[in-house]
């Protein structure tokens, strides 16, 4: 599972959105969730999101990797 924590006012988030959508289209084995931190503050708090964009990779219900800041597609794929 790849979670993308973002907000509409965040310029780096807008750079990551098309990359995450591309990965979702190409990698059907990966579930992708996009969480707007303004609309879901409780969920952002649960994941201790301090800055955005933040990408979280989960396996078997546990966080295995969490990174903040815009990342190129290659770096995101390497996280998976």
Question: What would you call each of these model-derived segments?
Answer:
Residues 2-3, 32, 55:
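Hydrophobic beta-strand anchors of alpha/beta hydrolase catalytic cores
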Residues 40-43, 74:
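Short loop/turn elements that flank and shape the SAM/SAH-binding pocket of Class I
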Residues 15-35, 39-41:
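Conserved helix-turn-beta segment immediately C-terminal to the redox Cys motif
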Residues 5-19:
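Conserved redox-active cysteine motifs that mediate thiol-disulfide chemistry
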Residues 45-50:
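A short glycine-leucine-enriched loop at secondary-structure breakpoints
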Residues 5, 34-35, 67:
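Structural motif
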Residues 51, 56-80:
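Non-catalytic, surface beta->alpha helical segment in thiol-disulfide oxidoreductase systems
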């Amino acid at each position: 599972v790849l979670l993308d924590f973002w907000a509409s006012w965040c310029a780096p988030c807008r750079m990551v959105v098309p990359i995450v959508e591309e990965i979702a289209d190409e990698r059907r084995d990966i579930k992708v969730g996009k969480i707007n931190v303004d609309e879901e503050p409780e969920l952002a708090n649960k994941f201790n999101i301090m800055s955005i964009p933040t990408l979280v990779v989960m396996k078997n219900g546990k966080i295995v990797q969490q990174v903040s800041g815009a990342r190129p597609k290659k770096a995101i794929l390497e996280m998976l």
